[in-house]
Amino acid sequence: MKINYTLILISCLTLAACNSGQKRMEQGDYDTAVYQAVKRLQQKPQNEKAEKVLRQAYTLAVNEHTNVIVYQDKTNNPFKYDVMVSEYEKIAMLNNAIRRYPMYKDLVELTDVTDELIMVRDGAASAHRKEGVRLLNSGNKQRAREAFIQFIKANEYVARTVTEEELDNAQNAGTVNVIIQFANSRNFFRDYNSDAVFGAVRNNFKGTRYRFMRVVEPGELSFPADEIVQIEMEDAHIGGVDFTKNS
């Protein structure tokens, strides 16, 4: 059997390039190249090819993320800080990955973005809070729901940017208060005290609160009804006995 040593050599070189992150770097996927280079160095410390890739790919990755940040900062997009947070977080993730290789300090100087992350997170939180207030002031239930989501996002960036009271106000403003009414469609039910059945079901719903829906009682003053939902039942199960069929 004739062995193709050339093919084996090419395969080995290709595998080495992939393991070191060289191929990813050549494709412009600098972040992945960094991660692959770090992984290779953890497996084989001081691997020259991986060290070279790490130095080059990290610089290229940071430059790429920084360019996006600079561009976004010049725009009038009120939510530009969302993108900037994402880009700074990607740099921070690269830094954390590189720190897992003990000898990284001899290879790269990490770009600390701690202060920048704090600043852009504040900007993102402020932008979402401002948008939430604008939506809430429209006096529209749908807008109030959107305001609630904006407030949630604000607090995801910086905790307590929006108070619990403000969140409750937005949620209440966007909530539909619903009365549930039951109607029996068969005379059969009237023979088996259907009021008791419906009453039990209604009590299970009473006071139920979903994110933007609340079940209320007729005439309840605290939460005036917005809609009435009428449920027509055709069967019931009482005490484990099936009364579906009238026979």
State where each predicted segment sits:
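Positively charged n-region of N-terminal signal peptides that target proteins for export
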Residues: M1-Y5
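Sec-dependent N-terminal signal peptides
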Residues: T6-I10
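C-terminal motif of bacterial Sec signal peptides marking the signal peptidase cleavage site
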Residues: L15-A17
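A structural "domain/chain start" motif
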Residues: Q22, E26-Y30, Y35, Q42-L60, ...
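Alpha-helical segments in soluble extracytoplasmic regions
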Residues: E87-A97
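A short, hydrophobic beta-strand-centered structural micro-motif
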Residues: V216-S247
